[in-house]
Regions:
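Hydrophobic alpha-helical membrane segments
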Residues: 19-164
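Bacterial Sec-dependent N-terminal signal peptides
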Residues: 1-25
Length: 164
């Protein structure tokens, strides 16, 4: 009996009556942020590609000679959504001027990719739950950097070529 009593006495010293209070949650780059950050990077790349096509098309054309101007050049490709390239003839195919415009030229495809990637990242982030305000600020900084890296990767190489 004394052995059991001694065992229970020693066991009680090692048991805790209260749960440990979890420490402050730390901001980390987890799987969720990698996925959503990648989507935002793709959105930034699409935006940078659009800006390149719109403002530095000559440098883009010099870098990729022989490209299809009817697909890539926004000054020409906007006509792809119309029959015979003439707005007076009406749409080239059903919803080619609205819902399916992304299938008519690169400029509209880039816009679609940009919006789809941003919206996908947003939908994934909505399910995360509450967190400290500081984490929202860090998320804002993280996603801004992701977007700018994507933008810079597809825009600045062509601005450097066009200034030469």
């Amino acid at each position: 009996m004394r052995i059991i009593f001694a065992f229970l006495l020693f066991a009680s010293f090692s048991l805790q009556a209260q749960e440990k209070k979890p420490g402050k949650p730390k901001w980390r780059i987890d799987k969720n942020k990698i996925i959503t950050g990648s989507l935002v990077l793709v959105a930034g790349s699409a935006k940078g590609f659009n800006e390149t096509l719109h403002f530095n098309y000559k440098a883009f054309e010099n870098t990729f000679p022989g490209i299809n101007e009817n697909w890539f050049n926004p000054q020409v490709s906007w006509r792809n959504k119309y029959k015979g390239g003439d707005p007076d003839n009406g749409p080239k195919f059903f919803l080619s001027t609205s819902a399916f415009v992304m299938f008519t030229d690169q400029y509209h495809l880039n816009n679609f990719i940009n919006r789809a990637a941003i919206m996908s990242a947003l939908v994934i982030k909505i399910g995360e739950g509450k967190k400290p305000f500081k984490h929202y600020l860090l998320d804002l900084l993280f996603y801004t950097v992701c977007h700018q890296v994507g933008f810079a990767a597809t825009y600045y190489p062509f601005t450097a070529r066009s200034s030469k």
